[in-house]
Amino acid sequence: MAKGRRDNRKKDDKPNSGLIERTVKIKRCAAVVKGGRRFSFAAMVVCGDGKGKVGWGYGKANEVQPSVEKANKQAMRSMVKVPIVDGAIPHRVDGRFGAARVVLLPAGPGTGIIAGSAVRAVCEACGLKNILTKSFGSNNPVSYTHLTLPTIYSV
């Protein structure tokens, strides 16, 4: 009987109606306390509809799954429209964030997404099909996600 009641409960999340969600980074942090180490997790997620809207979120929790869920909710709330022309960006654009630098170039049909992992996640989520990218100055995927989204928005 108790099981039947659980099955009838409403889910607290709405179905994400075809959104593309990419987990860019999951980070484990340790706080040293009297009894040992206490771990917490942080997740960065990029979310988009594949038709020009994309956003990112950063969530923290004591377990991995709640941190990813928090990041997803934040990413859905922060979605912004990106201009896409024939599956590519309209023109070349450069961006900087801290030491990281990225160059985004439009590419011809059939090229695909030529990018590193963090930049690729953003491009796939927003629906870009043909783009060339080059990243300089950092290896941190969180920095590149921070950098790529405002750079694409500025087009």
Regions found by a protein language model. Give the residues of each.
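Ribosome-associated RNA-binding proteins
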Residues: 2-147
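Single conserved hydrophobic/aromatic residue that forms the stacking wall/gate
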Residues: 146-155
